[in-house]
Regions:
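Short, well-structured beta-strand segments within conserved domains
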Residues: 204, 237, 245-256
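Bacterial Sec-dependent N-terminal signal peptides
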Residues: 1-30
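Short, surface-exposed beta-strand/strand-loop-strand elements in extracellular ectodomains
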Residues: 214-224, 261-272
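A glycine-anchored, Pro-Gly-centered beta-turn/N-cap motif
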Residues: 23-27, 123, 198-200, 244-248, ...
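Contiguous, well-ordered beta-strand patches that form the walls/edges
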Residues: 61-116
Length: 301
């Protein structure tokens, strides 16, 4: 009972996190990884159920933390028995400083009650390194995003009536604003996010994610300016970036943050069938880095 109480508090707390999803999924579940040491790590899965009960989607670990990581998940779900299993593989992006071979991938088996209001998913997991060694064990406990939204609505109704809470705080606590903050990759000043791709040429779209107010940015590749003084507007601007064989560190610098104090530029990167969306939230003179890591296409042995 205690563990469930702490998990509920934790679920509410992880909604102070940034988000936006452009792709729709059959299921979107939020909660935590509970390690055997009783340590909690925020966790999210979103997936579609395909033919033959096959599931495919993404996981997001340590949301808005220093090790935030997005990975593919693949597995199976039987809605008649409620049994579900999936494994993480192939990192899409990470904020972690660990090397790819040092990542601990989740292998999960448990129950998923998709017909219930909570959309409760829970069960055991084993964390596995690339070399198949075990790196962690514990449980995963998740509930549906819509269930949490209902809970937040109830809390918001109470807060809205409290006169001592200012309007800005009330606005940020609106359910639609809370939930809008949950799944996007947001980089702040001095932060670096590593994105893993298989291509040598990367298409990128750039636009103003907030209010159009005259934001101007410059992008440097390995400290050399490649796109200078771009005026960011609500209209998407498309560019193609040629990647070097080894290092591809792209620095986004806010030259002018416009009328508002903070520049919120959204960048969408395309790599074959993959897409990555990153929001750079930077004040004038601040910079953040997107590190593009080129991967080799795996060959069959």
């Amino acid at each position: 009972m205690k563990a469930r109480f702490y998990l509920l508090i934790y679920l509410c707390s992880i909604f102070n996190i940034a988000s936006q999803e452009s792709k729709k999924f059959d299921y979107e579940l939020l909660g935590a990884i509970v390690l055997d040491e009783n340590q909690l790590i925020s966790y999210k899965v979103q997936f579609n159920v395909e033919k033959n009960n096959f599931i495919e989607g993404y996981s997001l670990t340590d949301i808005d933390g220093e090790n935030e990581t997005k990975s593919y998940i693949r597995g199976y779900y039987n809605d008649k028995t409620d049994k579900i299993q999936f494994k993480e593989s192939d990192i899409l992006y990470t904020k972690s400083k660990f090397l790819p071979e040092e990542f601990c991938f989740v292998s999960f088996e448990g129950k998923f009650k998709s017909a219930s209001n909570k959309k409760l998913l829970e069960g055991k997991f084993v964390g596995i390194y690339d070399d198949k060694d075990t790196c962690a064990t514990g449980e995963i406990k998740l509930v549906g995003k819509s269930f949490i939204k209902k809970k937040i609505k109830k809390v918001y109704k109470k807060i809205k009536k409290v006169k001592r809470v200012d309007s800005i705080t009330k606005e940020s606590l609106k359910p639609e604003n809370y939930l809008k903050k949950f799944s996007e990759t947001k980089i702040k000043s001095g932060e670096k996010v590593s994105v893993f791709v298989y291509t040598s040429r990367l298409k990128i779209d750039i636009w103003d994610y907030g209010i159009e107010d005259g934001d101007i940015i410059t992008i440097l590749q390995n400290d050399k300016p490649i796109l200078e003084n771009i005026k960011v507007s609500r209209r998407k601007q498309s560019f193609t970036l040629n990647l070097d064989q080894k290092e591809n560190e792209f620095k986004i610098v806010t030259v002018n943050s416009g009328k508002l104090e903070t520049n919120t530029t959204k960048l969408k990167l395309y790599d074959f069938r993959r897409e990555y969306e990153v929001v750079a939230s930077l004040k004038e003179g601040e910079a953040a880095i997107i590190n593009i890591v080129r991967l080799r296409v795996p060959t069959k042995k």
